[in-house]
């Protein structure tokens, strides 16, 4: 590993430990040339994932977009940022488990709605109203009836 101080390619690992909930390894290194100590992180490189938008365009998967959407839906609700992060992690893991290179924005939205329905009814309705693009009250009513039917089954 190249030293950020002297740019020589001679360093040794002096400490390694798990980081980021075991999704990375943090390594403390020391340059054998100048003695400078620095930290590196090793992570699994995930294959690129493309999202196919409704208009057919493709863009790189961005978990922050999902997080922003669920944060907007969960405003002023008793939902912690940790719960929202876990929800987005679960959605991303479900997507990656499928082993696809592309996924439609519709499929992502359906996964998010499924997770939100289990977390908070109001956040689910808020997200659904944007995602499904309700044109009138009947769209809201249909989503409410779906939610009420789910509760009746429980």
Curated annotation (Swiss-Prot):
Binds 1 zinc ion. Residues 1-22 are annotated as: Disordered. One of its GO terms (biological process) is negative regulation of DNA-templated transcription. One of its GO terms (molecular function) is DNA binding. InterPro entries: ATP-cone_dom (IPR005144), NrdR-like_N (IPR055173), RNR_NrdR-like (IPR003796). Residues 49-139 form the ATP-cone domain. Pfam families: ATP-cone, Zn_ribbon_NrdR. A zinc finger (unnamed) spans 3-34. Its cofactor is Zn(2+). Keywords: ATP-binding, DNA-binding, Metal-binding, Nucleotide-binding, Repressor, Transcription, Transcription regulation, Zinc, Zinc-finger. Negatively regulates transcription of bacterial ribonucleotide reductase nrd genes and operons by binding to NrdR-boxes. Belongs to the NrdR family. NCBIfam families: transcriptional regulator NrdR (TIGR00244). This is Transcriptional repressor NrdR.
